[in-house]
Each structure stands twice: as C-alpha cells, then as structure tokens.
C-alpha cells in the first residue's frame, strides 16, 4: 500500500472507532474494546505511512478521501506520523483495560476523534486546513479534561491562539494570495515571510505547544485527567503546536537570525522553569506535565538551533539542531507515554495521584515499577536510554553554535549548554524524588499497602513503551541517519554528519558494568541472606520516618525561592476577574461543544 492509502485507512479506522464507541457507550467495556482496537489499528496504519515516507526519503501527495482535501506527507511530517502512531497504538491498547475501572467514563469518541484530527493536521497541505484540524483536535482534548474548570481555561486560551492564527492566515492570504504550503514556500523565496506573521504564528502555536509563559492550561489539564488523555495531551496535542512553529520558520528557507535566537531563548526558559516547577509538585500527573514543558523547551532548543543555522548558512548547525530536536520529539513522546500510563496504573490500583500517599509500590507492582524506572531515567537523559541520545545531539548543536560567525550565537552557545546541564540536574533530582517516594520505602496509606499488579494490557503497553525507550538509545547510530532525510533543506552530506552517541553512551554506562556482574554472580546467594529490622535507635519504624516529596525538594525550593514566586504571575487565572465563577465553566463547555459541532459539519460537508 502507498503512504496515502495507509493514511486514508488509518483516518477511517479512527473515525469508525469513534462513532462505534459512542454508539455503544451504554456498555462501557464493549465501548472500550471498540475504541481500543480501532484506535490501535488506525495508529498502526499511521505509523506505517510515516515510516514508508521517511525510509523512502521522498515526499508524496494525494487526497484524503474522507474529507476530500489535498494532503502531503514529507519526510519531515513523517516523523510526526510515526510519533502519533507509536504512542496512539499503546495508548489505545492501554485504554481497553482502563475502561474496567468503576470511576472511568467512556472516552473512545474523544480520543479517536483527537487522533484523527491530529493526523489530518500533520498531513495538511494548506495552512488554513492545518489550523482547522488543530482546532478540532484541541476541542476534543478539552472534553477529555476531568472537569469543567480545567476545560474552561484550555478553551479560553485555545480560542485566543486560534484568533491569532486566523489573523496570520488572513495576512498570508493578503500578501501571497494562497495558503497552500508548497506555493507559500516558493513565493517566500522571493518575498520572505514578515516577522509580524511569524510572531502571530509562534504565539498561536505556542499556546498549543505550552511554551512558557503561554503554558497556563498545561498543568491544570494534565493534573486530574485520565492517564490515556494526559498521555495524548503531552505526546500528540502539544507536538502539533511545535510542528506549526517549525513549518512557519522553514517557509522560504530564509529565516532571519533573530527568529532562531528567539526560539533558543524561549526554549531555554521553558526547559529550566518547567524542570524547576516539576520538582516542587506532588501530584504525579501535574509533575509530569511540568516535565513535558521542560522537554518542549529542549525540543525547541534543537529546532531553534536549526533555524539559527539557516540564518547563518551553516549546514552542520542546521543538521545537528533539527535532527536533535526531531529525535528528542520522538523520544520524549515514548518515555512520557511510559510515565503517564505508568502513573495511571498506580492510580488504577490505589486511587491516589499524590505521591505523598504512596510508597512501597515497587513491591506491589514490580512490572510497572521497573518500566517507570526506565521512563524516569530516560526523562533524566541518563544513558544508554533514548532521552540521552536526543539531548546529546542538541549539545553538539550548541558546540557548533559557539564556533559560528555571529557574536550573539557565540555568546549563546556556552550559556545554553550550561543551562541545559542545570536543567538535566533538576530532572535527575526529580527522577530520584518520584521513584524514591512512590515506589520505595514503606506504604503510607492502606490503598498503597493493598495495591496489586496492573491489568495485562495496561502492563504490556507500559513495558512495550519502556522497551522502545531502550531501543531508541541503543540503536541511535542507526536511527539518527534516517532522520537526516527529514531536514527539508538541501545540505552537503560531507558537512552535516551527526556525531553518533553510541561510544559516549557505552563509556558513560561502563560504571554500571560492575554492578551488573555482581548481581549476576551473587544472585543465587541473595535468598540465603538473613534479614532483620533496621536499627532505628530503639524506636520501631514508623511511616513518618520515610523521606517525603516536600522534604526532598526543600533545598532547591529555598535556593530558588525568587524564581518560584513567579508562578502566580504566570497563571492567567489570577489575572482575569470573575474567572472562578461556577456558571462560566458550563458556559465555556457548551461553547466548545457548539464550535466542535460546527467545525465537524463543515469538514464533513466538504467531503460529501
């Protein structure tokens, strides 16, 4: 099958699964199976289409028969298709067992519609259609939030972003007479894109991507959403915003230097602040949401380095920046899916998202515990996992930036490298905090003490994603050259070689070798050891003796108190009078439903 045929089949499966899951929503278990199987098949088709184009290194175009509009799949957006397909596959399988929980509501309609709209946005050949599909995707996500308050904030900020994007599209039409991306690219080679339109696009798509300070909806939406929904927010919805920013920045291939510098600065702020705020959180899903912001910033650093390379006409910098950013985009989606789905498995068995109420989960849920450890290590960019591989290439782009001709680039290169290293240290602290407080020590509540293993499909999905994280790190020397085909600019191969991180991975991982040998040699002697209670100065062990998440983060909280005080100023809710009114939440939800219905009718009528 051709890539276009695969995409048509994938979108058809998503839509069919959404409709059937809604029709059978009166039977929750059956609805879950329909949504899960249909979503998994649609995701497989989507990933296959992306893989076909990426390995072929040649873009294809055609029509999406369901809605009758032109689409294009380039090696660049093929990476988004692979990311959506892989994450959607395991989220869909996980979602089948998720429906077994008594407190869970049917979500097959929203999840599969979100996936279908996201795929259509990625392959859109027209910027206007891109914005419309991204809007449908965001509205589906609004209805996946746990309650009206979170959905209200997302809806309000989303409409602001859509308004800015609509203005940008209108200005593009006025200046270039088209919204077709291929025609825009050709015409902008003669008449470059204006910075006013670029700024509107960056703010509009930045609201969707969650770039700080445009991130207000991100922690609230993730905090109490279902695990499958939170995983899709992080791995699908926010990534579409990054695609929009990159698409605008690459049009015409003549970006000015300050665009790249602006993306680098925004990326560094987002990465550092996101990592810092994550360390202060105790709700595991809100914590992971802030870490998503951190990784959005890291991806933006890579993309910004690539755009800076375009302005400076440095092919090596373009290759390192874009390849590093794109590889980290894929890797982040994998390990963040592990973490959100793993956290959801813990909630499924304990009913708690507050890590202060957990503890000792590692003994109760060993499979999830090991998978979460892999995901947390990848999040902290520890070798030999995929999180390290992507960041290593981004570090290389900073080294190349330091050797460029522009003074501001030479100045930023070392500063960004140091800033990313500090952000990595915060991520390591957060990894130790989450795993230590949640999975080690003694249980702090009866629910944690009585936890049992997660259902089969949930465990399989989390473990499979964790294995993908290992493969993404170990197989980086073979995967990175494939991504070079996604760089949408003509480059000289001799000047764009990306240093493969395998040797560095192995060297850094060498200290683990003695521990592995010791575990193998002494494994048979461990059961014969006698065990007894630890000496605690004559007192019996109490639950209060275990280190808490609050205590773990206290030194950093005291050292960086001025930065943490900015949180209330970065929260848009505090700036809007009357926002907390109970009636406004229901009003916004109804407005979202009306807008979604209108957009769906318009899209369907185009294909009729």
Q: Language-model segments: which ranges?
A:
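Alpha-helical transmembrane segments
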Residues: 18-22, 275, 434, 513-523, ...
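Aromatic-capped, Gly/Pro-kinked transmembrane alpha-helices
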Residues: 479-505, 521-608
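Hydrophobic alpha-helical membrane-insertion segments
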Residues: 37-50, 161-169, 372-384, 461-478, ...
